[in-house]
Swiss-Prot record:
Highest classification ranks of the organism: Bacteria, Bacillati, Actinomycetota, Actinomycetes, Kitasatosporales
Source species, domain of life: Bacteria
Role of this protein: GTP hydrolase that promotes the GTP-dependent binding of aminoacyl-tRNA to the A-site of ribosomes during protein biosynthesis.
Protein family (similarity comment): Belongs to the TRAFAC class translation factor GTPase superfamily. Classic translation factor GTPase family. EF-Tu/EF-1A subfamily.
UniProt-annotated location(s): Cytoplasm
Species of origin: Streptomyces collinus
Chain positions covered by the region annotation G1: 19-26
Official protein name in the record: Elongation factor Tu-1
Binding site for Mg(2+): 26
Length: 397
């Protein structure tokens, strides 16, 4: 194997701004790009507030979300930053994971303190597995009383602790996004301080290739004289020829086999890794032993399950979703990775029904096992049409 070439590139981290409406998320996003552009002109372009605020609409799994993507660099890192103009866009983005976050900047206005959407975003961040939070206490220039600033900071820390973030330990940085954007030197420095806190407190994510091997099966073929080949895109990890793998999901029994060949673009490889579309030749496996929807994994790294809890967003009628609400015992299909499995929905106590456009927690019982872990995303479908999207928050069985 040729040695991997050494690339002088910075670590890449995905972050986003979350928090209550009008607390200054978009202004802060613009201020970060401006301040970093001023500090490191050759590394950064400044993005104006209007550019970010007029976020283009994206469609992810049939769901329309407005997301602004900006990128910038500190001395040590390269960041991709997402900001959503509307509250509904945040909810949709966080649940569908359209833009996955390695960490978030929670923006809280010092003039208001934590508000209902602050709570909702923190709860969602906890449920969908945003692992780290740094707080920007914004509009700090508008509060003269030190005691009030300290009280608001305490409130934010308590809120974060309530949702199992390390509220006492994580950084809370006082900033004024607007003043920084207007070129005020002192408040410009506050935004640099914030980014230093982000650099130091949001760890680099584990790269997909370093995780245990997993590939969802998309297709199965028989090649005469050679055996059974399954194709798919490697989701994570690295697989070498002659390694042992488990095939799990859909069926009750797992199958263990050896991969005797790995092909990509009709060429034989020594190994396949995350992101590559490959064909795997499996020893002693018949065509009917495996099917689309199963996954091939490093033995023992994932287990199949039928019962889980999830946070889901249900498409509105305008997004092509349902026109009517659904109730307890709703039975749609849950599309995991490459296949649909029917499941029965139990709504949280006190929730009679779920309207199109709502987000909700739910318990689901599938009729066939699916290889799953917390954080796994799925679409909710009715006869092939997407009516919702969600993420596994807890596995029950």
């Amino acid at each position: 194997m040729a040695k991997a070439k050494f690339e002088r590139t910075k670590p890449h981290v995905n972050i986003g701004t979350i928090g209550h409406i009008d607390h200054g998320k978009t202004t802060l996003t613009a201020a970060i790009t401006k301040v970093l552009h001023d500090a490191f002109p050759d590394l950064n372009e400044a993005s104006a507030f209007d550019q970010i605020d007029k976020a283009p609409e994206e469609r992810q799994r049939g769901i329309t979300i407005s997301i602004a993507h900006v990128e910038y660099q500190t001395e040590t890192r390269h960041y991709a930053h997402v900001d959503c103009p509307g509250h509904a866009d945040y909810i949709k983005n966080m649940i569908t994971g359209a833009a996955q976050m390695d960490g978030a900047i929670l923006v809280v206005a010092a003039t208001d303190g934590p508000m209902p959407q602050t709570k909702e975003h923190v709860l969602l961040a906890r449920q969908v597995g945003v692992p780290y939070i740094v707080v920007a206490l914004n509009k700090a220039d508008m509060v003269d009383d030190e005691e009030i600033l300290e009280l608001v900071e305490l409130e934010v820390r308590e809120l974060l602790s309530e949702y199992e973030f390390p509220g006492d330990d994580l950084p809370v940085v006082r900033v004024s996004a607007l003043k920084a954007l207007e070129g005020d030197k002192e408040w410009g420095q506050s935004v640099l301080n914030l980014m230093q806190a982000v650099d130091e407190n949001i760890p680099e994510p584990e790269r997909d290739v370093d995780k245990p091997f997993l590939m969802p099966i998309e297709d199965v073929f028989t090649i005469t004289g050679r055996g059974t080949v399954v194709t798919g895109r490697i989701e994570r990890g690295v697989l070498k020829v002659n390694e042992t793998v488990d095939i799990i999901g859909i069926k009750t029994e797992k199958t263990t086999t050896t991969v005797t060949g790995i092909e990509m673009f009709r060429k034989l490889l020594d190994e396949g890794q995350a992101g590559e579309n490959v064909g795997l030749l499996l020893r002693g496996i018949k065509r009917e032993d495996v099917e689309r929807g199963q996954v091939i994994i490093k033995p023992g790294s994932v287990t199949p399950h039928t019962e889980f809890e999830a946070q889901a967003y249900i498409l509105s009628k305008d997004e092509g979703g349902r026109h009517t609400p659904f109730f307890n015992n709703y039975r749609p299909q849950f599309y995991f990775r490459t296949t649909d499995v029917t499941g029965v929905v139990t709504l949280p106590e006190g929730t009679e029904m779920v309207m199109p456009g709502d987000n909700t927690e739910m318990k689901v019982e599938l009729i066939q096992p699916v290889a799953m872990e917390e954080g796994l995303k799925f679409a909710i479908r009715e006869g092939g049409r997407t009516v919702g999207a969600g993420q596994v928050t807890k596995i029950n069985k």
